């Protein structure tokens, strides 16, 4: 085979002059034998023509391909003269071409082809130095004809297929595009396997699947693993009785109950209502201008700043709701989220008024902070102090009265503290007439106060509920889905596998709810929303699940219903947690079935437990009644308030619809049961017959048996109509006597407060409160309701200003303002809220509320003593009253300063030098301008004279102190006190250094 090389020529190559001869020349006898060149390469094999033909084809194809890849400019070679040769047939691509038109160009083609091959061998180019971009391909200059298969050798030419296609561009440039090389044939199996998708981590499919040998190997391994001997089971490791070594906090949490262990400690861990959480945080952020004055965000300057839409911030927050909803936890988490440290006070344990006057007053009235000791390993580090937020828990459990030893009076002292802050906040610059400060006048709320209660309608909370000093937020119960997801995560942390249905059934049983299919429209749980009860029940179920078997069991719905709810012990445990308040119990008394789920029917439930004979059977209706009465008695006994439940049933049954005969049989039977309850209660508390305590709940059960009705759509519509009807009389219903007593007590308090602000002449005229109520107050209301038509004008900042234009109306306004000033009656701007918490507008409320004393019954035919007053009328009166108060304060200050300047001789300064004395004696010289006109000096006002005299006196006093050389020593002690203050300058502090 010939040696083929497309790179540089070796030193032993044939000289170029021997290769410039054309193919097909006949050799002469006198000349030496010429060497054969095929396709631009030397062929030394003369013996085997067939081998040379194959080598020629291969070398021709490879040289053509490599020259095209090098992409170098081929120089043109001039046509050299050649000897005339006889015409030979032309073969192109293995076919005979009889076209004689191109015979002239054939010889030029042969010469150019041979010379280009020689030049290519003389000027080798490395393949790595040639660029292969498309742009270089277009720049190649090809001056020779591309079809090189027209070489006519002396022997028959081989059949050579074309390797490129000639393309001519628009600008006349010719390009050669190589044909696509034949690729290896791909089998159908591999083509199908390449198109199929392979899952990650799975074996790659080839030839329609996995190799059968690998499958056999894997199956053999599985058989061997199954036949291998299993290891002996390891005994369960029992927990050690020794205390674990670690953090003290982790020890406490590991041994703590679930109610404390899984208490929410971050804002993101709260599962309650989001609206309630945001409302509490918004109220706490309202304290930022007071607690964090440097970090408080400045209000954005709006183009139209409507001051009326700004809601006044209230200093006290009251959280109310049923027990177990997480009110205390919510207050703690929100306070820490807002940057406070919580100071918790339990009002049930510390119910004395001294606690309010001591700890609570000091915490709220001072700008103190509270630090904490944080344990980092074995060391205790003092944490940076934070402002204090006071949380008073269970405020509805305090004693409303006041004992001799200070017991009770908690809410009264707290209410007085709130009202004192309200008075000090509303007070401007006026002081007492005698100039002395009263005790507690300067108290202000500087820290937030949060109150937590269960019943907002408790008697002890009436002052806070009726006044506008506290913002009341009703804590809503958490959604069942949130509680289920949280309990499922707790079971996962405890290592107990559970199903969602099982956890849901556990929550429903803890809340006293029925199943979804058995739950009706009016069926509610006795402890619905109580998260604490769910945690207690879940912990008890977890212990039971662990103790039943050593193998880990799964908490499912079937296991819970068969092993816990159907069991006597477990059923009584869940029923004992179904406690509710008095209002909930009374609502259940007058509901058929008491709102409980239906009892599961069985063989035992169809028999009377109090009858020994087997022949007596009980129907389904009596089974439901018996089940409801038993559960209702359990709720009454769990609440422990038997007397209140009975009295509430007595006051509520006249308003309930029930069916009875004309002889009033059911009310007579109810009175007999009330007599029975009074007899049992008196025997228990007087004769100490505690054995009769089990019969205290029977009267409540009797009311349920007599007056319970079905709760359907008709009764719901009936109740809606009753709520929409206007009340016939303010003191109507079963509790009319109590409502009248409370209203009388409230009116007496208003009268005493109004009468205490009277002057001596008014006290001589109106000595008793009855005279004030009948003679003075109706006329005062008419005086403060003048017949005027004010004009309301809004400024650029959308602040409304009301004014009157007529002189007669101005006179009426001035007389009304004089009445307000003499009696101490003011108007306070308050915000009206709708039931849903929306903004309902603004109104001016009279303080003290004298208009409430002259509004009588709403019965048709009776009207109020006065007509309703417009908002603009009271706005005009309030504006004029404020102007009058400012004017009087300025007059009092000026009169006080003038009296001091005239009575004290120290205020008059004598001239120090004789020149000033001469001026005072002979008068001052007249000042004239350039033209000789007299310049009039401005005469200072008396107020300016007083200010100049005071400034001169202060300067003289400072000179005396500096001349005397008085020294002041300043020492620092832990804390601070505002009892004694003295202004000291830096010169006095640095004078002794």
Swiss-Prot record:
Subcellular location: Nucleus
InterPro entries documented for this protein: AAA+_ATPase, ATPase_AAA_core, P-loop_NTPase
UniProt cross-references to SMART domains, sorted A to Z: AAA
Bias (Acidic residues) ranges: 42-51, 97-106
SUPFAM superfamilies noted in UniProt: P-loop containing nucleoside triphosphate hydrolases
Alphabetically ordered keywords of this record: ATP-binding, Cell cycle, DNA replication, DNA-binding, Nucleotide-binding, Nucleus
Annotated region (Disordered), positions in chain: 1-52, 65-107, 887-915
An individual GO BP term: DNA replication
Pfam families, per the entry: AAA
Residues binding ATP: 321-328
Top-rank lineage group of the source organism: Eukaryota
Keyword Oxidoreductase part of the UniProt annotation: no
GO cellular component: nucleus
GO MF terms, alphabetically ordered: ATP binding; ATP hydrolysis activity; DNA binding
Family according to the record: Belongs to the activator 1 small subunits family. CTF18 subfamily.
PANTHER family on file: CHROMOSOME TRANSMISSION FIDELITY FACTOR 18 (PTHR23389), CHROMOSOME TRANSMISSION FIDELITY PROTEIN 18 HOMOLOG (PTHR23389:SF3)
Physiological role: Essential for the fidelity of chromosome transmission. Required for the DNA replication block checkpoint. Replication factor C (RFC) complex has an essential but redundant activity in sister chromatid cohesion establishment.
Name of protein: Chromosome transmission fidelity protein 18
Species, as recorded: Emericella nidulans (strain FGSC A4 / ATCC 38163 / CBS 112.46 / NRRL 194 / M139)
Gene field: ctf18
């Amino acid at each position: 085979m010939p040696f083929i090389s497309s790179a540089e020529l070796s030193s032993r190559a044939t000289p170029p002059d021997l290769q410039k001869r054309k193919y097909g020349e006949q050799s002469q006898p006198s000349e030496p034998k010429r060497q054969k060149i095929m396709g631009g390469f030397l062929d030394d094999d003369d013996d085997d023509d067939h081998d040379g033909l194959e080598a020629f084809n291969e070398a021709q194809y490879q040289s053509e391909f490599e020259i095209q890849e090098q992409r170098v400019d081929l120089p043109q070679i001039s046509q050299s003269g050649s000897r005339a040769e006889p015409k030979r047939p032309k073969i192109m691509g293995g076919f005979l071409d009889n076209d004689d038109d191109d015979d002239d160009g054939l010889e030029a083609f042969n010469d150019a082809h041979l010379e280009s091959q020689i030049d290519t061998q003389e000027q080798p180019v490395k393949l790595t130095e040639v660029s292969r971009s498309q742009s270089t391909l277009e720049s190649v200059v090809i001056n020779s004809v591309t079809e090189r298969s027209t070489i006519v050798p002396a022997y028959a030419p081989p059949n050579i297929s074309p390797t490129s296609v000639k393309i001519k561009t628009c600008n006349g440039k010719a390009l050669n595009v190589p044909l696509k090389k034949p690729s290896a044939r791909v089998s159908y199996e591999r083509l199908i396997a390449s198109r199929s998708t392979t899952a990650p981590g799975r074996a790659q499919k080839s030839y329609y699947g996995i190799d059968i040998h690998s499958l056999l190997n894997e199956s053999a391994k599985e058989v061997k693993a199954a036949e291998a001997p299993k290891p002996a089971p390891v005994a369960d490791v029992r927990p050690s009785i020794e205390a674990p070594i670690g953090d003290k906090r982790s020890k406490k949490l590991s041994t703590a109950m679930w109610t404390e262990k899984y208490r929410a400690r971050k804002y993101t861990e709260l599962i309650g209502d989001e609206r309630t959480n945001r409302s509490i945080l918004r109220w706490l952020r309202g304290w930022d201008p007071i607690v964090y004055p440097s970090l408080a965000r400045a209000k954005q300057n709006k183009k139209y700043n409507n001051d009326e839409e700004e809601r006044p911030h209230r200093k006290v927050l009251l959280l109310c709701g049923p027990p177990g909803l997480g009110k205390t936890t919510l207050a703690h988490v929100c306070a820490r989220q807002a940057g406070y440290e919580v100071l918790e006070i339990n009002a049930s344990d510390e119910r004395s008024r001294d606690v309010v006057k001591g700890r609570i007053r000091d915490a709220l009235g001072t700008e103190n902070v509270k630090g904490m000791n944080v344990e980092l390993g074995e060391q205790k580090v003092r944490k940076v102090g934070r402002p204090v937020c006071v949380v008073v828990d269970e405020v509805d459990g305090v004693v409303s009265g006041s004992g001799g030893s200070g017991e009770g009076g908690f809410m009264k002292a707290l209410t007085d503290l709130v009202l004192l802050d309200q008075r000090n906040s509303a007070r401007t610059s006026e002081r007492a007439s005698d100039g002395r400060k009263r005790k507690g006048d300067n108290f202000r709320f500087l820290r937030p106060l949060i109150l937590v209660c269960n019943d907002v309608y408790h008697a002890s909370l009436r002052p806070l509920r009726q006044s506008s000093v506290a913002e009341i937020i009703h804590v809503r119960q958490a959604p069942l889905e949130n509680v289920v997801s949280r309990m499922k995560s707790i079971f996962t942390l405890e290592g107990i596998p559970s199903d969602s249905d099982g956890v849901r059934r556990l929550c429903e049983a803890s809340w006293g709810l029925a199943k979804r299919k058995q739950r009706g429209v009016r069926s509610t749980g006795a402890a619905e929303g109580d998260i604490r009860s769910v945690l207690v029940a879940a912990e008890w179920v977890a212990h039971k699940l662990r103790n039943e078997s050593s193998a880990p069991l799964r908490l499912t719905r079937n296991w819970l219903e068969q092993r816990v709810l159907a069991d006597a012990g477990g059923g009584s445990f869940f029923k004992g947690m179904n406690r509710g308040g008095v209002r909930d119990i009374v609502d259940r008394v007058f509901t058929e079935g008491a709102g409980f789920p239906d009892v599961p029917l069985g063989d035992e439930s169809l028999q009377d437990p109090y009858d020994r004979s087997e022949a007596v059977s009980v129907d389904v209706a009596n089974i439901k009644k018996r089940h409801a009465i038993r559960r209702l008695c359990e709720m009454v006994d769990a609440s422990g308030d038997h007397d209140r439940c009975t009295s509430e049933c007595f006051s509520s049954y006249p308003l309930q619809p029930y069916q009875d005969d004309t002889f009033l049989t059911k009310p007579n039977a109810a009175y007999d049961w009330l007599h029975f309850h009074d007899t049992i209660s008196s025997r228990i508390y007087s004769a100490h017959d505690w054995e009769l305590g089990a019969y205290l709940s029977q009267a409540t059960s009797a009311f349920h048996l007599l007056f319970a009705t079905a709760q359907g759509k008709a009764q719901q519509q009936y109740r809606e109509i009753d709520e929409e009807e206007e009340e016939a009389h303010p003191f109507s219903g079963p509790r009319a006597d109590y409502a009248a007593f409370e209203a009388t007590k409230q009116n007496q308090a208003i009268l005493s407060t109004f009468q205490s602000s009277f002057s001596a002449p008014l006290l001589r005229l109106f000595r008793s409160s009855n005279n004030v109520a009948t003679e003075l107050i109706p006329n005062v209301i008419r005086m403060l309701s003048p017949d005027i038509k004010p004009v309301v004008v809004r400024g650029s900042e959308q602040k409304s200003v009301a004014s009157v234009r007529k002189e007669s109306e101005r006179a009426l306004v001035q007389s009304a303002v004089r009445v307000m000033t003499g009696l101490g009656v003011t108007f306070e701007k308050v915000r009206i809220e709708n039931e849903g918490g929306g903004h309902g507008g603004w109104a001016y409320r009279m303080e003290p509320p004298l208009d409430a004393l002259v509004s009588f019954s709403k019965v048709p035919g009776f009207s109020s003593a006065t007509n309703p007053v417009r908002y603009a009328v009271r706005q005009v009166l309030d504006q004029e009253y404020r102007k009058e108060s400012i004017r009087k304060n300025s007059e009092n200050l000026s009169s006080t300063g003038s009296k001091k300047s005239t009575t004290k001789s120290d205020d008059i300064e004598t001239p120090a030098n004789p020149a000033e004395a001469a001026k005072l004696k002979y008068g001052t010289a007249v000042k004239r301008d350039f033209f000789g006109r007299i310049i009039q000096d401005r005469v200072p006002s008396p107020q300016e004279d007083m200010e100049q005299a005071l400034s001169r006196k202060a300067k003289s006093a400072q000179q005396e102190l500096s001349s005397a050389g008085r020294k002041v020593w300043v020492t620092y002690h832990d804390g601070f006190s505002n009892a004694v203050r003295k202004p000291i300058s830096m010169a006095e502090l640095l004078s002794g250094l």
